[in-house]
Amino acid sequence: MAKRDYYEVLGVNRNATEAEVKKAFRRLAMKYHPDRNPGDKDAEVKFKEAREAYEVLCDSRKRASYDQFGHAGVEQTFGGAGAGGFGFGDLGDIFDDIFGDIFGGARGGQAREQRGADLAYELVLSLEEAVHGLSRTIKVPTWINCKTCNGSGAKKGSSPATCPRCNGSGQMRMQHGFLQVQQTCSVCRGRGQVIKDPCTDCHGQGRQQQTKTLSVKIPPGIDTGDRIRLAGEGEAGLFGAPPGDLYVQVRVKPHPLFHREGNDLHSEVPIDFTTAALGGEMEIPTLDGSVRLTIPPETQGGKQFRLRGKGVKALRSGAVGDLICHIVVETPVKLSPEQKDYLKQFAELLKKDEKNHSPRTRNWFDSVKDFFTSK
């Protein structure tokens, strides 16, 4: 059976905020949680469906993938929602609100601050930038504390009042037969206070949307998959609560000359067949300038030369990798008739000589001969 749209499951629109998604899930969890519907298979299915939708829509990366590619995007990129198994521990504060007080066990009932959401930002770097490090300015759309009310949500000169329904606890106790549960107050949404005279700039939310400009220091040696945490640079919390963090995810672009493996750099170095046979010197580029590489006579294709200390300085240990040059011997092309004649004469000279000028070729033919004669 085809999966339902996650937004439809939770009953929210596609532009719903994280807080709205969480609120919708709380409502469904209260209604369909298995502990409140023992033996009801239909309720269990609906609860699992709501939980799966919540896990995707409250995760910024999963939600972006879902919005673009649907269910297939989440399954292919993240292994599907709830890939870690069906459990309740990862829903933390939501189940604290719903089942914080079972069988009369009090939990203290104090209002809880709603910390701002964490943000993710992908930073694309060149290989040179990743190896040497730099400072980069980035622009991040986010929520900041309202400067007019300093995040309180109340109009200047006024202040929030104690919620008349929960008396400032932020939570309400509900009795369902022998089961007593404690849930977030629907009036103050767990804050314990209400705004009677809201700030006109932020409309009582205590925060406003703004694009924040930040300077990020990129340490030398960083690589794709590494991330930098900027504490407190995420979204502002609701009504003056602490902000979340910003995680800068690094992605290094492919380089035309070098391929990185750990702290080593690899590069293909093409040489003509005369240099391979007679030897010579070449100018080899590195990320710190060029160096001279001596090619010894009779160098074969696939030969590797290791240039010590010309790789990447490790991000944590400080050890420096090497540059490994992979020799590629090129066969000449677009030969003139005269050049072809010289090569034919050269080939005849090699045949007349009893020396083994191509040991790998001879060994290969000997192996082929042995293979067929042994049949």
Swiss-Prot record:
GO terms for molecular function: ATP binding; heat shock protein binding; unfolded protein binding; zinc ion binding. It comes from the Bacteria. GO terms for cellular component: cytoplasm. CXXCXGXG motif repeats lie at residues 146-153, 163-170, 185-192, 199-206. Pfam families: DnaJ, DnaJ_C, DnaJ_CXXCXGXG. It is found in: Cytoplasm. Zn(2+) 2 binds at C163, C166, C185, C188. Its cofactor is Zn(2+). Its main location: cytoplasm. Keywords: Chaperone, Cytoplasm, DNA replication, Metal-binding, Repeat, Stress response, Zinc, Zinc-finger. Zn(2+) 1 binds at C146, C149, C199, C202. Binds 2 Zn(2+) ions per monomer. A zinc finger (CR-type) spans 133-211. One of its GO terms (biological process) is DNA replication. Residues 5-70 form the J domain. SMART domains: DnaJ (SM00271). Homodimer. The J domain is necessary and sufficient to stimulate DnaK ATPase activity. Zinc center 1 plays an important role in the autonomous, DnaK-independent chaperone activity of DnaJ. Zinc center 2 is essential for interaction with DnaK and for DnaJ activity. Participates actively in the response to hyperosmotic and heat shock by preventing the aggregation of stress-denatured proteins and by disaggregating proteins, also in an autonomous, DnaK-independent fashion. Unfolded proteins bind initially to DnaJ; upon interaction with the DnaJ-bound protein, DnaK hydrolyzes its bound ATP, resulting in the formation of a stable complex. GrpE releases ADP from DnaK; ATP binding to DnaK triggers the release of the substrate protein, thus completing the reaction cycle. Belongs to the DnaJ family. This is Chaperone protein DnaJ. The gene is dnaJ.
